[in-house]
């Protein structure tokens, strides 16, 4: 009996890890990966960090260059797909080539959610999603520049930190570093994925670094001239050399939509990463999961891309699905490393340590059960915290925040 052929569509973290997971879980059939990027699949998190800070940064590949050939995975880079061929099981490229598939994994990722008012600025406006975006930004984040960033989510704050650090490192004694202003519609920073005490810490951290953060505000009018003139809802006018925005994502779902798969700013999948077509799976930023209660949930993180790649591979091969660890992601801002794990909801967080010393852990207890945590420059503690959250361990709050008691002894 001829082995089936699996095609992966996409060139990012989820796509590469799906290929790796399929081989690791025993799939020996024909395996193809199609990507519109010419690079080998590379890590996205460094784009807002080291790719902006280093003078000659190198892309960090998800898998070693020799892995693809050694594992007999056929890479098709720099190609454009015309249709997935849901009915015919024939993927068609714009160059006329067609490729048969028995199962399909879609990991086309997402793009920056558009902001037409700023997109009209053309090359003077920046978003960050690909290596080319980081290369363009690296060139313009120079001393003396005025930089306006729209959006104070994770990417917006990382960009603010990187812009401040890069210009400070490059300036001469007579030059000033970038003047960075962040505009945020909400009343706080990182409102979607950080608890209140961490939001307050990050706001203060950026302000101390010289970043101006304007909350409860938005751009109403833009005039393009020698500098970009931005008029805000508050009535204030800003002058900018560089304008960057990051206000969320827009899933790259067009191919799926044209194939009549269920979409809702993302390809709708179940908890096995299966779409409404049992032969088609999806994962990473392009996917949105329908939970048991019918709600749609998207998790935009490096780890989620890895997890869904493993889940989809197991489901495609008819194997038991791996157990999911608690959600986890990290953010590097200035010299700080913050790691977020578990449930970020709720207002009653406990703090172990002193954030003013840039070393602390915030804990989220629900009826004594640890359900979430954030570490500030305490990454070594994530491993035991992950185990505690997975096991539903209960704690005495006073003992948990007592620095005289080692966490590992609890």
UniProtKB/Swiss-Prot annotation:
Residue positions annotated to bind NAD(+) are 146-184
Q: Where is it found, in Gene Ontology cellular component terms?
A: cytoplasm
Q: Which GO terms describe its molecular function?
A: 3-phenylpropionate dioxygenase activity; ferredoxin-NAD+ reductase activity; oxidoreductase activity, acting on NAD(P)H
Q: What is its EC number?
A: 1.18.1.3
Any S-S bridges, and between which cysteines?
Answer: none
Residues recorded as binding FAD, renumbered to this chain, are: 5-36
- Cofactor(s) demanded: FAD
Pathway membership: Aromatic compound metabolism; 3-phenylpropanoate degradation
- Reading the lineage from the top rank, the first entry is Bacteria
Q: What does this protein do?
A: Part of the multicomponent 3-phenylpropionate dioxygenase, that converts 3-phenylpropionic acid (PP) and cinnamic acid (CI) into 3-phenylpropionate-dihydrodiol (PP-dihydrodiol) and cinnamic acid-dihydrodiol (CI-dihydrodiol), respectively.
Q: Which HAMAP family match?
A: HcaD (MF_01651)
Q: What is this protein called?
A: 3-phenylpropionate/cinnamic acid dioxygenase ferredoxin--NAD(+) reductase component
| The organism of origin for this protein | Shigella flexneri serotype 5b (strain 8401)
State the organism's lineage: Bacteria, Pseudomonadati, Pseudomonadota, Gammaproteobacteria, Enterobacterales
Q: Which gene encodes it?
A: hcaD
């Amino acid at each position: 009996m001829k082995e089936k052929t699996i095609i992966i569509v996409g060139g990012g973290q989820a796509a590469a890890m799906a290929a790796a997971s399929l081989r690791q879980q025993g799939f020996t059939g024909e395996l193809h990966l199609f990507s519109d990027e010419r690079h080998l699949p590379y890590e996205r998190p460094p784009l807002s960090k080291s790719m902006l800070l280093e003078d000659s940064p190198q892309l960090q590949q998800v898998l070693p260059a020799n892995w693809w050939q050694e594992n007999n995975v056929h890479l098709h880079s720099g190609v454009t797909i015309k249709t997935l061929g849901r009915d015919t099981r024939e993927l068609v490229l714009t160059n006329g080539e067609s490729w048969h598939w028995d199962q399909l994994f879609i990991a086309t990722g997402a793009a920056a959610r558009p902001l037409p008012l700023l997109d009209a600025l053309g090359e003077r406006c920046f978003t960050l999603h690909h290596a080319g975006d980081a290369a363009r930004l690296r060139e313009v984040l120079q001393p003396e520049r005025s930089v306006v960033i729209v959006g104070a989510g994770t990417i917006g704050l990382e960009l603010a930190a990187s812009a401040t650090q890069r210009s400070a490192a490059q300036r001469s004694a007579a030059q000033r570093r970038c003047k960075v202003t962040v505009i945020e519609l909400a009343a706080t920073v990182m409102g979607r994925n950080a608890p209140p005490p961490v939001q307050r810490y990050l706001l203060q951290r950026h302000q101390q670094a010289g970043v101006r953060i304007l909350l409860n505000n938005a751009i109403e009018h833009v005039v393009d001239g020698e500098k970009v003139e931005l008029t805000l809802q508050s009535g204030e006018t800003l002058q900018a050399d560089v304008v960057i925005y990051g206000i969320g994502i827009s899933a790259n779902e067009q191919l799926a939509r044209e194939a009549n798969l269920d979409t809702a700013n993302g390809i709708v999948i179940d908890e096995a990463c299966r779409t409404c077509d049992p032969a088609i799976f999806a994962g990473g930023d392009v996917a949105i999961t329908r939970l048991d209660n019918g709600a749609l949930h998207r998790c935009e993180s490096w780890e989620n891309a890895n997890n869904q790649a493993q889940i989809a591979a197991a489901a495609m091969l008819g194997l038991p699905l791996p157990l999911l660890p608690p959600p986890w992601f990290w953010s590097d801002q200035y010299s700080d490393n913050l790691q977020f794990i578990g449930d970020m909801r709720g207002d009653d967080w406990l703090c172990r340590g002193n954030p003013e010393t840039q070393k602390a852990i915030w804990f989220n207890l629900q009826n004594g059960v640890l359900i979430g945590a954030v570490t500030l420059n305490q990454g070594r503690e994530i491993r035991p915290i992950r185990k505690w959250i997975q096991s539903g361990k209960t704690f005495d709050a006073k003992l948990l925040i007592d620095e005289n008691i080692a966490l590992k002894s609890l």
